[in-house]
C-alpha cells in the first residue's frame, strides 16, 4: 500500500520496509502490523492530516494540549477571593510560591489525584524500589517514557506560568518552589527550585553522572531503531479519549502502552562512565528528596512572610511540611487548588479555582507594577 496516499501526503517514507510493516484500512483507522521483536504486534492508529501531529508542530498547540478534560471542573473565581489573593501579593515582601500539578493541567499535562487524574483510572506510578530492583520495570518505564516524550515536550507554558513569571519580574515573588518535573516554569521565564527534580535530565544511580534527556532519547532510538520507528508513527490520541488506543499520557510524561511493545528486545543504554543504571532525575514515590534541596526549601519557607500554594493537594509530606512550617512561623498562608488539600484545616485562605484563571484576574485588579503579559 502507498503510505503517502494513506497519510494524505503528510509524511513520506515512514515505513521503508514492506517486509516489516503491513498497513491495512479498517473503519477509518490505519491498522499496522509491525514486527516488534520476534513476532508481529497489532496496533491501531488514527490517520493524521496536515496541521496535525505529523504536520507543522511549531504552530498552535495540538488539540490534546488544550483538552479541558485534563483540567478539573471549577466555578469562576468570585471577586471576594480575587481581592483576598490580590492583598496577599500587595502586602507581602518575602512571598514564597509552591506550585503543583494544577498549574500544568491547563497545559494538557494530567495530574494524579483530581477526578480526571491518573489515579482515577487505577494507574499506579512506578516506585523508586521497583525501578532500582527490576530490569523489567526499567524497560517498561523507559519504553513508555520514550513513546510519550515528543507529546510531553510539545506542551507550552500556560496562563499560570506566564502570570507567575511576570509577577517574579515585578519583584512580587521572592522565591518559587515547584513539585512539577515538566520545566514549564523555566520556559515561561522563571527559575524555581525543582523539589522533585526534572525529567529533562537523566542520571546514573552508581556514579551520579548526568546528561540531557534529549541525548538519552537519541540513544534509545539508536539501539532500538525498528521499535522507535514503529512507535513514533502512532498518533496517541487525545487525553481521556476512548480512541486513544490504550496510550494515555501520564503526569511524568510517559504513556500507557501495551507490554507487547517492550517486554522483549527493548534495550536500555547504560552509563557511559561506569556502565551503571540510568534513571530520570526525578524523585519517584518511595524515594527521598536530596537533603541539601529539602533544607533549602524549608529555610525559605520559614523565612517567608507569605506562603502561597498553587495547584497542589499537598498530599506528599515534603510539600505539606513546607506549608505547615511557613504557617507556624507566622507567614500569611493561602492555597489555590481545585479540591481538598492536606492543609485545608490550618490555612486561613483556601480558594477553589483554576490557578491560571484567578492569577490573571488578580493582575487585572490593581497596580502590582507587573509587566504586560
Swiss-Prot record:
Q: Which residues are in the Deacetylase sirtuin-type domain?
A: 75-373
* Highest taxon above the source species: Eukaryota
Q: What induces it?
A: Repressed by pathogen infection.
* Cellular compartment(s): Mitochondrion matrix; Nucleus
Its cellular-component GO annotations read: mitochondrial matrix; nucleus
Q: Which residues bind NAD(+)?
A: 100-120, 179-182, 311-313, 337-339, 355
Q: Which InterPro entries match?
A: DHS-like_NAD/FAD-binding_dom, NAD-dep_sirtuin_deacylases, Sirtuin, Sirtuin_cat_small_dom_sf, Sirtuin_class_II, Ssirtuin_cat_dom
**Known catalytic reactions:** N(6)-acetyl-L-lysyl-[protein] + NAD(+) + H2O = 2''-O-acetyl-ADP-D-ribose + nicotinamide + L-lysyl-[protein]
UniProt-recorded name of the protein: NAD-dependent protein deacylase SRT2
Which source organism? Arabidopsis thaliana (Mouse-ear cress)
Q: What is the lineage of its organism?
A: Eukaryota, Viridiplantae, Streptophyta, Embryophyta, Tracheophyta
The gene that this protein is the product of is SRT2
Amino acid at each position: 500500500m502507498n503510505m503517502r496516499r494513506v497519510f494524505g501526503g503528510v509524511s513520506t517514507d515512514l515505513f521503508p520496509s514492506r517486509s516489516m510493516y503491513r498497513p491495512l484500512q479498517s473503519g477509518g483507522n490505519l491498522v499496522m502490523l509491525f514486527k516488534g521483536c520476534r513476532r508481529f504486534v497489532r496496533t491501531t492508529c488514527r490517520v493524521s492530516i496536515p496541521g496535525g501531529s505529523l504536520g507543522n508542530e511549531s504552530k498552535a498547540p495540538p488539540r490534546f494540549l488544550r483538552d479541558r478534560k485534563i483540567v478539573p471542573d471549577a466555578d469562576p473565581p468570585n471577586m471576594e477571593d480575587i481581592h483576598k489573593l490580590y492583598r496577599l501579593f500587595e502586602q507581602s515582601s518575602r512571598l514564597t510560591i509552591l506550585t503543583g500539578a494544577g498549574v500544568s493541567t491547563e497545559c494538557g499535562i494530567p495530574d494524579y489525584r483530581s477526578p480526571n487524574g491518573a489515579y482515577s483510572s487505577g494507574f499506579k506510578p512506578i516506585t523508586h524500589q521497583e525501578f532500582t530492583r527490576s530490569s523489567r520495570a526499567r524497560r517498561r518505564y523507559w519504553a513508555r517514557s520514550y513513546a510519550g516524550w515528543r507529546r510531553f515536550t510539545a506542551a507550552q507554558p500556560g496562563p499560570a506560568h506566564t502570570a507567575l513569571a511576570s509577577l517574579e519580574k515585578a519583584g512580587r515573588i521572592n522565591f518559587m518552589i515547584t513539585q512539577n518535573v515538566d520545566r514549564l516554569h523555566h520556559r515561561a521565564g522563571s527559575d524555581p527550585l525543582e523539589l522533585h527534580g526534572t525529567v529533562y535530565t537523566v542520571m546514573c544511580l552508581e556514579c551520579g553522572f548526568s546528561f540531557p534527556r534529549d541525548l538519552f532519547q537519541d540513544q534509545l532510538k539508536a539501539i532500538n531503531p525498528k521499535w522507535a520507528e514503529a512507535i513514533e508513527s502512532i498518533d496517541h490520541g487525545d487525553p481521556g479519549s476512548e480512541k486513544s488506543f490504550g496510550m494515555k499520557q501520564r503526569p511524568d510524561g510517559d504513556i500507557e502502552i501495551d507490554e507487547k511493545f517492550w517486554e522483549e528486545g527493548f534495550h536500555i543504554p547504560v552509563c557511559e562512565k561506569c556502565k551503571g543504571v540510568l534513571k530520570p532525575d526525578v524523585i519517584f514515590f518511595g524515594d527521598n528528596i536530596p537533603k541539601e534541596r529539602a533544607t533549602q526549601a524549608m529555610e525559605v519557607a520559614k523565612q517567608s512572610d507569605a506562603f502561597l500554594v498553587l495547584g497542589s493537594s499537598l498530599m506528599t509530606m515534603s510539600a505539606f511540611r513546607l506549608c505547615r512550617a511557613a504557617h507556624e512561623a507566622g507567614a500569611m498562608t493561602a492555597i489555590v487548588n481545585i479540591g481538598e488539600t492536606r492543609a485545608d484545616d490550618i490555612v486561613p485562605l483556601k480558594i477553589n479555582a483554576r490557578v491560571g484563571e484567578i492569577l490573571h484576574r488578580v493582575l487585572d485588579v490593581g497596580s502590582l507594577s507587573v509587566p504586560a503579559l
